[in-house]
Amino acid sequence: MMSQGGTVYLVGAGPGAADLMTLKGRALIEQADCVVYDALVSPVMLSWAKPGCEQVYVGKRAGNHALPQEQINKLLVECGRKYACTVRLKGGDPYVFGRGAEEAAALYAAGVAFEVVPGISSAIAGPAHAGIPVTHRSHCTQFTVFTGHEDATKTESTLDIAGIAAAKGTKVMLMGMSRLRSTLEQLMAAGQGGEVPAAAIQWAATARRRRVIATVATLADAVEQAGLGAPAVVVIGDVVACAPELDWYSRLPLAGKRIVVTRTREQAGELSSALSMLGADVTELPTIRIVPPTDRKDFAAAVVDSPHYDWLIFSSPNGVRKFFEAFFAVYEDIRELGGARIAAVGAGTAAELKKYGLMVDVMPKKAVAEELIAEFDRKADEFGGVANVTMLWVHSEKGRDVVYKELMKRQAIVDECIAYNTVPETEDPTGAKARLQEEGADLITFTSSSTVKNFMAMGIELPQGCKIASIGPITTATLKEYGLTPDIVSENHTIPGLVEAITAGFAS
């Protein structure tokens, strides 16, 4: 009988890439009160957790255990009794060499409710990411998966080397890099053909992937020469010969490029996802955080009065989101805005407005305030100018005042609606800063002046050879204030435009 309390979910994190997590797995992380995670879990997955969620690292790598398994079992029992929802996030699938069954048994014995959420195993996804199918009608119709790292407390091995050597089809070894040479020698001694194609894939199914292709007899030497290590998947079989034709990942335009995204934690997803889809290894290092404005009363009053204005002017997508969060706390219907016309600085802001069913009347081609003013001037005959017209300008606390000053010069009646403020991000739960400093990067992206200023305030030295990408002229100007000239500048000052510019930049 299960005791009263919460539920512990044993969730498979998949083979490495965050976008290969199951929908149920992500939903559980988003609602979790506590996440207990392993070493090979993508940091992006941890960023899905809600504010206040306790995150406990219990990673285990060969020879380096943050916490012994018995203590992990005890911890899960404690969390299950303390929290309504605990996610035990495990690389790959919880029940494929993941000791998930041991954890489930410990929870059952303690009377703690648990569920298992399967994940995509690296035994299948790792080879697939490297162009190697584990089955193929022309080569094999079965495959064998075995571990190269058995329980050290066993008095004798339960691994059937002779059976594996004699087995037909593809053979996949997980967690075997530290014993690769001896395992391959044992297999050949038991009858495994040394001339059979073999491959080792490090960081399989991630943008950091490295691959070595050889034969069973030569793979250990090839791995040493290439400097490959754990974590890795080893594949033995004729299907390895498919890799040159079926290696789709290496043909992606940003394959293997390490790119840093400095947007807010909430906004990073759009850019990160687009870059990842093109093959990039993305590190999210938020440098800013969106917080309420200093004067919340003024903001609330401006939102309440917004239906009385002739024009609403939005300077950023953040301004749109924060404005309408407050608007719908007061009004139930978007039509309460009345007949106000809408102006937006940039296509990104216009796209955010469209989510609320609002189309813009004025939008410059370039997402800068000066261009918005010029657009108002160009359309003066169409709208009758801005003199004596009431306008509510929705912007950030640290935004430039170009819009306000220029419209006032044209005798518009402009009120400000400060919808949010940006502050430096002080938390780094995923260790992104350390990863950047230790592993470097090919490119760092900046999407606003605030991201530049706060990144520089972190005191991080730019990695040697690292390029810089800027979303537009204002961000570029801020970079130059710090003596930095971006290598890539987006002509279309939107996230899709920045992605396009980055892709073109690396192609050249």
Which residues fall in each region the model found?
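Class I S-adenosyl-L-methionine
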Residues: 1-18, 23-120, 124-125, 220, ...
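Short, well-ordered beta-strand core segments
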Residues: 33-35, 55, 86, 133, ...
